[in-house]
Amino acid sequence: MALLQIAEPGQSAAPHQQKLAVGIDLGTTNSLVAAVRSGEASTLVDQQGRSILPSVVHYTSVSYTTGDEARANAQTDPKNTIISVKRLIGRSLSDIQQRYPSLPYQFEESDNGLPVIRTEQGNKNPIQVSSDILRALGQRAESTLGGELSGAVITVPAYFDDAQRAGTKDAAQLAGLHVLRLLNEPTAAAIAYGLDSGKEGVIAVYDLGGGTFDISILRLSKGVFEVLATGGDSALGGDDFDHLIAEHFQEQMGLSELTAEQNRILLDAATEAKIGLSEAESVNVEVLGWAGSLTREEFEDIIKPLVKKTLLSCRRALKDAEVDADDVLEVVMVGGSTRTLLVREMVGDFFGRTPLTSINPDEVVAIGASIQADILVGNKPDSEMLLLDVIPLSLGIETMGGLVEKIIPRNTTIPVARAQEFTTFKDGQTAMTVHTVQGEREMVDDCRSLARFALKGIPPMAAGAAHIRVTYQVDADGLLSVTAMEKSTGVQAEIQVKPSYGLSDNEVASMLKDSMTFAKEDMQARALAEQRVEADRVIEGLIAAMQADGDELLDEQEKQHLLQAIEALIEVRNGESADAIELEIKNTDKASQDFASRRMDKSIRAALSGQSVDNI
């Protein structure tokens, strides 16, 4: 693995000239851009002094506007005013229509299958709309910093899938931005607080924005953030606080119905009151001819059910991550709605520690991204040269049948950590060999073997019942650590290896070329191996079942029928046709269906034996 060294060119005419790089928080509701200047990370403002750019684009037949100017058209021209486009990135047209049926836009499906929105300026897909937002942020950055950008780190939600991440990257490239890295939003927030260089352990990132809530549970180990679990509510945010306050005002005013204009005015008043109560104990309200007040206590009573709802998501995320609230070292607050004192108080009580709130919660993600961007372009003193690398060949594990299951794909930026769960193949299996390989081929024999180790002490149980979590972690120096842990007992084993050791660039290129040359043959070999593994599972399972219950549940003719089915499957299994094996597996399953039903009935009778109706 060749390391790419990025540092100030010591022999250059301007040895201390800094490269211009930014961090961009491309948000659902709002977006920001930040940069490190004179060693300090801060957000960049527009000509009106605003750091926040609403994630809105308005199209006319000849031009487009972004931000506040675009949002002003939301009421009068909703079909051409695209809001919250981040929700649409990487989704199919049917998915969008199912998830967001009330959107005012006119959708079509393009030739390449991407959904497009009909506007006065023509059809626009979500990637193009996002690129217009990113272009505005890039132009702001270049104007403020006084030069051309070398690159940008763009943040994405931790739960974004490959299609959504690829769409975000495409949007940035369309906007003329060189993407240094896509960074998970919770990781960016943790970096902003310097947690990446702090003590190792579990970190919670609580992100309550205007329209969405996200909770992420991270583990920091050897400088690598691993996402343990994510959760949240895509339809819960600070906007919901505003709506509840507005409803309270409407009730106080005695109005049963409001016009759209009155509703907007009331919501603006609710937002203003909410912001005021972050500092004051009460605020006076004058709106639509009504004068009243709202105390912090009243406000907190109104929003408490929603805050409790976010804590339910936190509880689920902790359960998914298999950690307790007591295990969390730090809680990072993200999103403007976390300024609300009740939110900070209830989150602090839930996790048993004071949340980190010293950085502006609207800006913390962009600031963390800018710190990462500054590192990635090499803005370090000569004594702190940066090593930037990607994994040149996929890292995987051998599974039954000599197959390769890829854990970390090639071209993944390091440091990185990925985990996957596996199980046992045979009843009573108490050990498992973990064989780590490198390469792009489908079969172990065609890949490079890196290391083997055994995980022992697996409790004997039925095949498929054990849960073994295998974690691959590559640090900034390219050192791979492989850990296997049986989840019920916690027994684990680990090994470290340098995947790049002894591997030249020519060998890497040769391995990549082979993967393309033999792609068709490899997929055929994989399909055959998978069917053979499945056939072995069916054969072993059926033989074991007959040994256990055959004499009791089968007559002699039925036994012979099943034995013939097993023999037929064994014969085909040793052949070279994956389709033939698959067909014979189906025939064997069909032949044994009645036997399986009898075994199930026997198990149920045994389980219910001696039980009273009340107990059941």
From Swiss-Prot:
Keyword Nucleotide-binding included in the entry's annotation: yes
Protein keywords: ATP-binding, Chaperone, Nucleotide-binding
Molecular function terms, GO-annotated: ATP binding; ATP hydrolysis activity; ATP-dependent protein folding chaperone; unfolded protein binding
Family matches, as Pfam families: HSP70
Record flagged with keyword Chaperone: yes
GO BP, sorted A to Z: iron-sulfur cluster assembly
Function in brief: Chaperone involved in the maturation of iron-sulfur cluster-containing proteins. Has a low intrinsic ATPase activity which is markedly stimulated by HscB.
Entry-linked NCBIfam families: HscA, PRK05183.1
PANTHER family listed in its UniProt record: HEAT SHOCK PROTEIN 70KDA
Protein family per UniProt: Belongs to the heat shock protein 70 family.
Protein name in the entry: Chaperone protein HscA homolog
Gene name of the record: hscA
